[in-house]
Amino acid sequence: MSWLQKLLPPKINRPAGNSRKTVPEGLWSKCPSCESVLYRTDLESNSEVCPKCSYHNRISARTRLNFLLDAEGRSEIGMEVQPVDPLKFKDSKRYIDRLKTTQAEVGETDALIVMQGSIKAVGVVAAAFEFKFMGGSMGSVVGERFVRGVQAAIDNNTPFICVSASGGARMQEGMFSLMQMAKTSAALTRLSKAGLPYISVLTDPTMGGVSASFAMLGDVIIAEPQALIGFAGPRVIEQTVRETLPEGFQRSEFLLEHGAIDMIVDRREMRDKLATLMTSFMRVPAGAA
């Protein structure tokens, strides 16, 4: 052994072969807001809300309904209603092909899921948007499922809740899509005449034709923190009016300050808040909730 080898630290014995350990994909997640690296399981157990800065990540419609509804006694409404292509629409891709691709990628048939169930033993019909399905855009299927959900609430004398997350009307369906604004609003009029409450929950983002119709028609309008809510996006507005918009414009906190919504509720507290509101509206005995 040379004098140089004696000065160098001994080599670390490594087992033969490739011993490098790999970290499984999806084990960690980085918060888009505070950039904290979070253990995926911890994030899921915290309702997809960052435990460091309380940033609300976007979640799927089924995850949302799993958070809100009791585990027992659920049934899906309107799942047999499937999208079609009445206009034979084509942009860079045929609409019918875009639907098939999105259905395969997302695992849902359209952008709205409606379920009948309960929240803390209080009966309810709840709808939730799947934003990953073409930006949660509202087409004929979304409108029809929404209306069927409202009718189920009327038939069963329960409140109706809709959790919105949408970019607006689905351009590939043209006027068929825009007609859903009137169709859904008319259904909510029937719900109101039946003396039943409609609670609208706005999440990031709630825009376009959805915000211009049923999303803002709730007896109580709740928003998640920092949700983007409006008709046209802030960039489009700035380009149109040629002015710089105020800080926080179209965010939940801005809308609450200006009286456009009733309250902001953290996702982790949403189930309790909805149960309290429904108990009050329906005059359910306190022990039942």
From Swiss-Prot:
InterPro entries (alphabetical): AcCoA_carboxyl_beta, Acetyl_CoA_COase_Trfase_b_su, ClpP/crotonase-like_dom_sf, COA_CT_N, Znf-ACC
Cofactor(s) named in the record: Zn(2+)
Pathway info: Lipid metabolism; malonyl-CoA biosynthesis; malonyl-CoA from acetyl-CoA: step 1/1
Enzyme type, top EC level: transferase
Localization (cell): Cytoplasm
Domain of life of the native organism: Bacteria
Gene Ontology CC terms: acetate CoA-transferase complex
GO molecular function terms noted in the UniProt entry: acetyl-CoA carboxylase activity; ATP binding; carboxyl- or carbamoyltransferase activity; zinc ion binding
Name listed for the protein in its UniProt record: Acetyl-coenzyme A carboxylase carboxyl transferase subunit beta
Organism, scientific name: Methylobacillus flagellatus (strain ATCC 51484 / DSM 6875 / VKM B-1610 / KT)
Name of the gene this protein is made from: accD
